[in-house]
UniProtKB/Swiss-Prot annotation:
It is a multi-pass membrane protein. One of its GO terms (cellular component) is plasma membrane. GO terms for molecular function: phosphotransferase activity, for other substituted phosphate groups; undecaprenyl-phosphate 4-deoxy-4-formamido-L-arabinose transferase activity. Its main location: membrane. The keyword Lipid metabolism applies. This is Undecaprenyl-phosphate 4-deoxy-4-formamido-L-arabinose transferase. GO terms for biological process: 4-amino-4-deoxy-alpha-L-arabinopyranosyl undecaprenyl phosphate biosynthetic process; lipid A biosynthetic process; lipopolysaccharide biosynthetic process; response to antibiotic.
């Protein structure tokens, strides 16, 4: 693994209804980036916020010599689509993704950049002393385990969005055309060298989590169906297993009927119904998984854009001082011109 030279760093932050945390987020993120020896930009993507987030981002981007780039989407497309929109607009050799809720401190950015300079394609993070509820932690652990089994890349915390990506990984992800994606997994599918660092995790100070129970369920389906065909293979295995169990059970019923007579068979009616419901449930699960895959194929065939960018706002460099000519001598306001 060779060191990776970095000239420019981009920070990409998706924003959705975060007007209360934005002033502190901008201040802390810019202060953390000032510690770097590289040039930098802070790309904030407003994902269809219903509060004043877009106006705050626009004002920040319009400041003279501001490092902020404001990307305004026309509606809400979801966290990962917003990040992909930021990837399209950023130009860094290394790109850092960060959530806007300040649960992961921006002060960790220099550590991730230092790891990326060592030559890693992807630098993941693991949340230390995670402040989320058990309702969020346990499903996250199950998802991480399932992702590790599906991708073969052993990372401990796929749910933490504070991550660093090399430019080549960003370009590879932008070349993908699927509508639904999960960026940490997609990045690892292109990465050769990956690592993780331990980062602090704070409680959310403003607002509520944007991941409701229904959104978490949708995210789990995205993880299951958008990155691997393993569930389809498991479905075939389960189907063969259930068919085998059904054949054995039918054989057992025939033998028991021959031994105990028709009376026993009548008493076993409820057992048959129970088994029928089990197999029927398995069939519906399989049909649901097939429906998910077919739905995603339908979305990809339509080839609609993943998002629509309404506008991009960048700061303009400071205008040069006007030249003043006195007695044939030209000067700016910083020069001293003798009368």
């Amino acid at each position: 693994m060779k060191p990776y030279p970095i000239q420019f760093v981009s920070i990409v932050i998706p924003v959705y209804n975060e007007e209360q945390s934005l002033p502190e987020l901008l201040r802390r993120t810019e202060a953390a980036c000032r510690q770097l020896k590289h040039e930098f930009e802070i790309v904030l993507v407003d994902d269809g916020s219903r509060d004043e987030s877009a106006n705050i981002l626009q004002a920040a981007a319009e400041r003279e010599d501001s490092p902020v780039v404001a990307v305004i989407l026309n509606r809400n497309y979801g966290q990962h689509a917003a990040i992909m929109a930021g990837f399209e607009q950023c130009r860094g050799d290394v790109v850092i993704t960060l959530d806007a809720d300040l649960q992961n401190p921006p002060e960790e950015i220099p550590r991730l950049v230092a790891q990326a300079e060592l030559g890693y394609d992807v630098v993941g993070t693991v949340r230390n002393n995670r402040q989320d509820s058990a309702f969020r932690r346990w499903p996250s652990k199950l998802i991480n385990l399932a992702v590790q089994r599906s991708t073969g890349v052993a990372m401990s915390d796929y749910g933490c969005m504070l991550r660093a990506y090399r430019r080549t990984i960003i370009d590879a992800m932008l070349a993908c055309t699927e509508r639904s994606t999960f960026i940490p997994i997609l990045a690892n599918s292109f990465a050769r060298h990956t690592t993780e660092v331990l980062v602090e995790h704070a409680e959310r100070e403003h607002g509520d989590s944007k991941y409701s129970p229904m959104r978490l369920i949708n995210l789990m389906f995205d993880l299951i169906t958008c990155m691997t065909t393993t569930p389809l293979r498991l479905l075939s295995i389960i189907g063969f297993g259930m068919a085998g169990l059904g054949a054995l059970f039918a054989l057992m019923l025939i033998v028991l009927r021959l031994i105990f007579g028709a009376t026993w068979a009548g008493d076993g009616t409820f057992v048959l119904f129970a088994v029928l419901f089990v197999f029927t449930g398995g069939q519906f699960i399989g049909m649901g998984l097939l429906g998910e895959y077919l739905g995603r194929m339908y979305s990809d065939v339509r080839a609609r854009p993943r998002f629509f960018i309404e506008k991009v706002l960048r700061s303009q460099p400071a205008a040069p001082a006007p030249a003043v000519t006195v007695d044939g001598l030209t000067s700016t306001h910083t020069d001293q011109v003798s009368p």
